[in-house]
């Protein structure tokens, strides 16, 4: 998508002159820009119902799903998935291609509405405003390739009324402070991924959702991203990392959930020395490989 200086000034001037319109679209912009997602529809789901369960430590869980289901034209893509994501951890959502991982993440970020089941965020039923506290990078980051890293972030902070000081903060977190006037279109794939994460961090999220962030990266890019993800829990950010690259996941995550055939076949702490590959294959064989 091409965006030049005139386009930016036109948008920003129009928003400044029409404060009523700014108020009306601000919530929608947050849903799109904070999460780093461009949605195909302007419709966002409303509040999702939540069923309480006894015996769970709610203070320790930032996100829970209960019997989450998604049906596409009569075929169950996600079937009664109940996740428990601990605060300030890195949670690996694993599964073969087509297992249902991306469908689950799209329900967590409001892109898809669950057919049934419930989602709870930070101790309350998930609602649209919670997207202000959730950052996400799903698929390729939405970048203006003819703008610099700083300018890409400036577009978002201006539209959303955020302090520009946050731009340098997130650029420092993702180690993109020295890119100067280099345009995003000239960035390596790893740099683009990190800029996408910077966009998702602008709202200081409590939860960061990353869908296959290392896809296509070279070994150096993977190592840089690994160290970045490892640093987030110390900053008070919980990470849900979706991936099928087991060797990489094993070096990053604290807990794992393994999806196969749309079913959660395993969830638990990843202990030192545990054979994740064998566990993964056992779950996949037991539950099948079909899914979305």
Give the location of each predicted region.
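Helical segment within the ABC ATPase nucleotide-binding domain
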Residues: 222-235
């Amino acid at each position: 998508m091409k965006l030049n200086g005139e386009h930016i000034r036109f948008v920003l001037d129009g928003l400044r002159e029409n404060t009523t319109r700014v108020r009306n679209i601000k919530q929608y912009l947050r849903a799109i820009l904070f999460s780093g997602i461009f949605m195909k529809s302007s419709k966002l789901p409303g509040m999702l119902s939540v069923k309480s369960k006894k015996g769970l430590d709610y203070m320790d869980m930032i996100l829970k799903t209960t019997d989450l289901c998604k049906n596409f034209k009569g075929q169950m893509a996600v079937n009664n998935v109940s996740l428990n994501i601990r605060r300030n951890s890195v949670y690996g959502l694993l599964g073969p291609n087509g297992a249902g991982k991306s469908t689950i993440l799209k329900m967590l970020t409001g892109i898809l509405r669950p057919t049934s089941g419930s989602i709870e965020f930070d101790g309350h039923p998930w609602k649209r405003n919670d997207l202000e506290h959730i950052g996400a990078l799903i698929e390729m980051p939405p970048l203006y390739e003819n703008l610099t890293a700083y300018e890409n972030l400036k577009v978002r902070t201006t539209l959303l009324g955020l302090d520009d000081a946050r731009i340098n903060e997130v650029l420092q977190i993702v180690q993109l402070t020295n890119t100067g006037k280099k345009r995003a279109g000239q960035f390596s794939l790893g740099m683009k991924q990190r800029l996408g994460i910077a966009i998702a961090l602008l709202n200081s999220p409590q939860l960061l959702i990353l869908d296959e962030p290392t896809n296509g990266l070279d070994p150096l890019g993977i190592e840089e991203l690994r160290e970045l993800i490892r640093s987030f829990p110390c900053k008070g950010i919980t990470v849900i990392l979706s991936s099928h690259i087991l060797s990489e996941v094993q070096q990053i995550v604290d807990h794992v959930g393994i999806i196969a055939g749309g079913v959660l076949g395993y969830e638990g702490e990843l202990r030192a020395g545990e054979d994740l590959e064998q566990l993964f294959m056992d779950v996949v064989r037991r539950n099948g490989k079909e899914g979305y």
